[in-house]
Amino acid sequence: MYKKLIKYLYLSYFFLFSLNIYSNILLDENDKLQSPLPLPYNGITYTEDEINNFIDDTIKNNKRPILIFGANWCPDCRIFSGTMNIPKIKSFINENFNVMYVDVKRYEINMTLLKEFDIPYSEGIPRVLVFDEKRNILNNSNTTEWRTARDRSSQEIFNFFQSMSSIN
């Protein structure tokens, strides 16, 4: 009996230990994209100084800065933004990040700001840049990943933010 108990405790401990502590928070059936989708882009042309101040201020507040280049005419931008507004995702983002939406209109404004971060020009939005505390772009190799947000699940978008947080 004692050996069975020890074996059971050992297996239980092993199972609990093998769980990923940083496993993703899962969405449930209540976490749905709401209509109408948001229009987060405001038509403002930003300077490099304004962008740099946003990044620096966010880092000083112990959060990770996110720049999202996009436009209100783009369905992928609106779906991505709408997904970020799902309450569970929004709460997570507010705890870990500070987000700045950068309007590009029809690729007419703010596009030169991408050069500041060595991001090559290419069409397709949203372009999402997530920075760490040293101003490094964490997703430098895949800033174009969300150009197909309409084909992705809300959970995939949430997993992206979870993987970019300082928790991981």
Q: Residue ranges of each PLM-predicted region?
A:
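The canonical Cys-X-X-Cys-His
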Residues: 74-78, 128
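Non-catalytic, surface beta->alpha helical segment in thiol-disulfide oxidoreductase systems
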Residues: 123-168
